[in-house]
Every structure is written in C-alpha cells, then in structure tokens.
Amino acid sequence: MTTASPFPNLQNQQFMNLTTYRKTGVPVTTPVWFAQVDDKLYVYTQANSGKVKRVRNNGKVEVSPCTRSGKPLGPTQPALAHILPLEEGKRVDTLLTNKYGLLKRIISFVAKLRGSTPAYLEIRPA
C-alpha cells in the first residue's frame, strides 16, 4: 500500500516558496530549491540567512510550489521547520545534488570559496 505524499502540491516541482515569519509575525516568502524524502522536505541555505534566523525563532512555515522567481503555482500548505545539525548536511547535499546536478555543485563551490557556512532545514507537515 502506498502512502499519499504529505506535500502533494510539490510533487515534480523544482522550486517552492518557503514562507517564514519575523518576530513581529510579518511573513517573508522566498523561492528555494528543495528535496523531498518520504514526509520531509530539505532545504540548503546559508547559516547567516534570514530564513535560518526566522526558523530559529519560529518553526511554523508555509510551503507552496512556485516558479524560479517565486510566482505561486499552487496552494500554500502549513508546515514545521527546524535547523538540522551541520553533520547531517552531507546527506542533504547529496539529495539536492541528485535533483539539481551541476548547478547545485557550482553554487556549493562558490559558497565554499566565499567562506560561507551552510545550514540545512528539515520541513515536516504541520
């Protein structure tokens, strides 16, 4: 028996809008790459990004399919996000590289050259 995906609107999508919330409650929506494994979504970003700061303060997020530029392609779904320990990042990097290929490798290389510290978000259905 196959279990239905908890994120059906994100099936076969390349980008999703991730909406996080400032301490004031104001939403901030950002288009991001993601990988889905079972009932979880994984996102790569930089440790000093606004997304990470906002998730650290409030793990309630919303996700929806979108274009590369963030134009919504479907309904928004509530979810819960948390920051993964850095040692779990290799697995997430592999998932994202499998999905996005050379472009993901280039982005990771440039980030490493800049001395950026990566951060990885795990997102589950709310």
Predicted region positions:
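Short beta-strand segments
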Residues: 13-47, 62-65, 74-78
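A general marker of short, structured functional hotspots
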Residues: 3, 17, 30, 38-40, ...
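Short, basic/aromatic recognition patches
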Residues: 1-16
